[in-house]
Regions:
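Non-heme di-metal
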Residues: 1-127
């Protein structure tokens, strides 16, 4: 089991190309409630975004076929994070949106159509 975990971590580290800074790890470990709250919000937003794509582009059958199970999966992740938070006595509450996502969304084209969809999908992949 440990060999497999080491192998999985090595695969992940190879993919990321850079080591996570120790300061970030220490900050995250010292702020688990905030980390979990942020994670819950990210899962909720991912589910909502997938549902919004289904609503906005119902004529794109392939997109709908991909987004429906994605929305379901992200909502399940949301529920799992909420359960972990409850076990730890952490209350799900509002969280100030990050500037990172807001700044990315400023670059989405104002045109409707495929260009806007592509911009939104690229930003979703980045986030």
């Amino acid at each position: 089991m440990l060999k497999r975990l080491d192998s999985d971590l090595q695969t992940l580290n190879d993919f990321l190309k850079t080591k996570t800074p120790e300061a970030w790890l220490n900050h995250a470990a010292a702020n688990i409630p905030l980390l979990l709250l942020d994670h819950a919000h990210c899962e909720r937003k991912a589910a909502g975004t997938a549902i919004n794509f289904i609503s906005k582009y119902p004529e794109k059958a392939e997109l709908v076929a991909i987004m429906a199970p994605l929305a379901r999966e992200e909502l399940l992740h949301f529920e799992k994070v909420i359960d972990i938070m409850k076990q730890k006595g952490i209350v799900y509450s509002p969280l100030q949106p990050s500037d990172y996502a807001s700044n990315l969304h400023k670059h989405v084209t104002n045109k409707d159509g495929i260009e806007r969809l592509c911009d939104q999908l690229i930003i979703g992949a980045i986030i």
